[in-house]
């Protein structure tokens, strides 16, 4: 962005209302260039943002934010919105530590009406905001902008049903429509679409409804008959359009890159006093030929070379890739294995499986709850379903994990990708809750691999079990093999790495924290403090006697975990040791018994964590290698211990 560019002069959405259409075209070109430059450098969501520039400008030309609220579904297509609402000077910090979020964030701007990150939530949120405005005597309009992909989520249709029933003036803009929504048919339907938003038609409709409704005794009944007749007529020309069936007016399709047309339709839509769906067709990746040709490759992308679109090469394999390879290897030997994803085939590493075993691959769409119950159904029919799902999206299916899977003790395997801190995407995408959510669930087993070989061993072991099993792993490079962790899997037992016979400090960790712990252990050794490492392998169940036997020779135990501290495995293990020490010495000498061991837990504290690199998030959360070193040294030198009141005696399921 240059000093004298149009974009540099846009301080807020009101400024774009002063521009001519020629200036708007120039502004769109500048915005495309800025998005391409910043995403090329920082990484981010490219194709979707390049496709909604004109739509975003048109929305802000017609409506007045923040008086009128715009809710962006998922939110990854909000870059233009951010730039024209006073954040263009900081746009270069997009997705960087302490920089702009890649998603709408109320804490960032009054123009961000609602925080989003997960799909299919916008219509529900927008409807709630609209009702809140009405109750507060606020006349502002509310617009939900949702992509056709997010329309595969059931929550979107729940909200449409509710909105149609309430008959409030909610505006839903569907971007693209390449899924399953039928196009209108014939010239008359196009006329009807134009007529629906014409001001004269709307005034006539209002006066007619009012006049008919005022007829004594039969007015309301007549209105009801006319309303049903109108819906029936629309159904003929809209081929059973689902939005009409929900009680919405329906407008479109509209060219999403023609700002004159967009503004004209939006101005008419703004005057409606009933819910309306406006279908806008856009080109994903618009203006960047490589993204137009292959929008999927440029949906979410790391830093790349703009000239050829190539991402910086990294020879290391990721945990996602390691999982994909291991699953294909297992499926080649076992025809019962099926793979399920919730619209994240590539992101979860299932593309190779899909190409090799298309009849055993299932994409449930953005419907995590359905995906889990579908997998449970497969398991009940004798299959071995593996549901690959991001940790952050697993949260959306907890009821199905408990009700449909675990109560029946069905052998569904959950491959939980992006467990632990997730770089760049912020609070809505952190994978910090899965252990705390799944540990209390009866019949559930949770494993945490630290390497490619260990992941393969765990998957092979899981496929031989008859209960629900979760295998959680981070969004990170995956070590090929850690020799100590290549031994066979024993239920509830981890692996001890002894660095010295004289070690008095033990550091326990989940697989995703092993590299940080290993680095910390090396630093401590250099400082003359020897530590041993215990890779827990299992977050559940825990072989308590085995674990207590491992820890009995250590005076200082530090528990490290890539999840929330509240409800953590580490807190459970700490309570197990404290309970054991208390019982060992007897209730009369409880305090003396606890002094035999000093313990501490390093995990993510009770807050939401922002975007940044994994190392920046580790440091910000106080669980980096440096913090582990400090905690171990403090534990070794302090004279006090954790009080008994902090330990919750929990019985392992």
Swiss-Prot record:
Keyword Magnesium: yes
Catalytic activity, EC: 2.2.1.7
CDD domains: TPP_DXS, TPP_PYR_DXS_TK_like
One Gene Ontology cellular component annotation held by this UniProt entry: cytosol
Annotated residues for binding of Mg(2+): 148, 177
Cofactor(s) demanded: Mg(2+); thiamine diphosphate
GO BP of this protein: 1-deoxy-D-xylulose 5-phosphate biosynthetic process; isopentenyl diphosphate biosynthetic process, methylerythritol 4-phosphate pathway; terpenoid biosynthetic process; thiamine biosynthetic process
Pathway(s) it belongs to: Metabolic intermediate biosynthesis; 1-deoxy-D-xylulose 5-phosphate biosynthesis; 1-deoxy-D-xylulose 5-phosphate from D-glyceraldehyde 3-phosphate and pyruvate: step 1/1
An example Gene Ontology molecular-function term: thiamine pyrophosphate binding
UniProt binding sites for thiamine diphosphate: 76, 117-119, 149-150, 177, 288, 368
Entry note: cofactor: Binds 1 Mg(2+) ion per subunit. Binds 1 thiamine pyrophosphate per subunit.
Catalytic activity, reaction form: D-glyceraldehyde 3-phosphate + pyruvate + H(+) = 1-deoxy-D-xylulose 5-phosphate + CO2
Pfam family, one: Transket_pyr
Record flagged with keyword Metal-binding: yes
Entry keywords, A to Z: Isoprene biosynthesis, Magnesium, Metal-binding, Thiamine biosynthesis, Thiamine pyrophosphate, Transferase
SMART domains for this protein: Transket_pyr (SM00861)
PANTHER family per the UniProt record, alphabetical: 1-D-DEOXYXYLULOSE 5-PHOSPHATE SYNTHASE-RELATED, 1-DEOXY-D-XYLULOSE-5-PHOSPHATE SYNTHASE, CHLOROPLASTIC
Role summary: Catalyzes the acyloin condensation reaction between C atoms 2 and 3 of pyruvate and glyceraldehyde 3-phosphate to yield 1-deoxy-D-xylulose-5-phosphate (DXP).
Subunit note: Homodimer.
Family: Belongs to the transketolase family. DXPS subfamily.
Name of the molecule in the record: 1-deoxy-D-xylulose-5-phosphate synthase
Organism encoding this protein: Treponema denticola (strain ATCC 35405 / DSM 14222 / CIP 103919 / JCM 8153 / KCTC 15104)
């Amino acid at each position: 962005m240059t000093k004298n560019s149009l974009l540099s002069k846009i301080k807020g959405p009101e400024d774009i209302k002063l521009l001519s259409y020629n200036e708007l075209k120039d502004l769109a070109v500048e915005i495309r260039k800025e998005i391409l430059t910043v995403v090329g450098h920082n990484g981010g969501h490219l194709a979707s943002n390049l496709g909604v520039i004109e739509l975003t400008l048109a929305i802000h030309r017609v409506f007045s934010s923040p008086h009128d609220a715009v809710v962006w579904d998922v939110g990854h297509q909000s870059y233009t919105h951010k730039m024209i609402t006073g954040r263009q000077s900081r746009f270069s910090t997009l997705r960087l530590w302490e920089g702009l979020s890649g998603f709408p964030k109320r804490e960032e701007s009054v123009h961000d009406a609602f925080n989003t990150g997960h799909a299919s939530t916008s219509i529900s949120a927008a409807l709630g905001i609209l009702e809140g405005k009405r109750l507060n005597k606020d006349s502002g309009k509310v617009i939900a902008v949702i992509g056709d992909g997010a329309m595969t989520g059931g929550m979107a249709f729940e909200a449409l049903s509710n909105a149609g029933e309430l008959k409030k003036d909610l505006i839903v803009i569907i971007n693209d429509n390449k899924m399953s929504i039928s196009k209108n048919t014939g010239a008359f339907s196009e006329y009807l679409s134009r007529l629906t938003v014409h001001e004269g038609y709307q005034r006539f409709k209002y006066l007619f409804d009012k006049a008919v409704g005022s007829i004594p005794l039969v007015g309301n009944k007549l209105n009801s008959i006319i309303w049903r007749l109108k819906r029936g007529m629309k159904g003929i020309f809209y081929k059973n359009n689902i939005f009409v069936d929900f009680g919405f007016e329906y407008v479109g399709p509209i060219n999403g890159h023609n700002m004159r047309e967009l503004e004209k339709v939006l101005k008419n839509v703004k005057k409606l006093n009933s819910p309306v769906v406006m279908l806008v067709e856009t080109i994903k990746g618009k203006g960047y030929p490589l993204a137009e040709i292959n929008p999927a490759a440029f949906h979410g992308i790391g830093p790349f070379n703009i000239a050829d679109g190539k991402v910086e090469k990294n020879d290391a394999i990721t945990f996602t890739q390691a999982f994909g390879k291991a699953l294909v290897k297992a499926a080649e030997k076992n025809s019962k294995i099926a793979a399920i994803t919730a619209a994240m085939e590539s992101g979860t590493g299932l593309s190779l499986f899909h190409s090799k075993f298309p009849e055993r691959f299932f994409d449930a769409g953005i419907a995590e709850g359905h995906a889990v119950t579908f997998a449970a159904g497969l398991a009940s029919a004798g299959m071995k379903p593996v549901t690959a799902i991001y940790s952050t999206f697993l949260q959306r299916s907890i009821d199905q994990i408990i009700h449909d899977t675990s109560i029946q003790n069905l052998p569904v395997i959950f491959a939980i990708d992006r467990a632990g801190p997730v770089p760049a995407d912020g609070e809505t995408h952190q994978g910090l809750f899965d252990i705390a959510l799944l540990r209390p669930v009866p019949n559930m087993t949770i494993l945490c691999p630290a390497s490619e070989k260990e992941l393969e061993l765990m998957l092979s072991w899981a496929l031989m079990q008859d209960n629900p099993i979760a295998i959680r792993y981070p969004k990170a490079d995956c070590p090929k093999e850690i020799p100590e962790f290549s031994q066979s899997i024993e239920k509830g037992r981890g692996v001890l790495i002894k660095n010295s016979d004289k070690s008095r400090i033990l550091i326990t960790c989940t697989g995703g924290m092993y590299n940080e712990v290993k680095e910390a252990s090396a630093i401590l050794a250099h400082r003359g403090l020897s530590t041993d490492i215990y890779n827990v392998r299992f977050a559940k169940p825990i072989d308590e006697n085995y674990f207590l036997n491992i820890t009995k020779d250590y005076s200082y135990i530090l528990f490290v975990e890539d999840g929330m501290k509240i409800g953590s495995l580490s807190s459970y293990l700490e309570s197990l040791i404290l309970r054991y020490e208390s019982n060992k010495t007897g209730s009369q000498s409880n305090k003396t018994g606890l002094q035999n061991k000093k313990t501490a837990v390093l995990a993510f504290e009770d807050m939401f964590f922002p975007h940044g690199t994994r190392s920046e998030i580790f440091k910000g959360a106080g669980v980096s290698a440096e913090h582990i070193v400090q905690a171990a040294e403090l534990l070794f030198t302090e004279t006090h211990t954790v009080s008994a009141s902090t330990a919750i005696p929990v019985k392992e399921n």
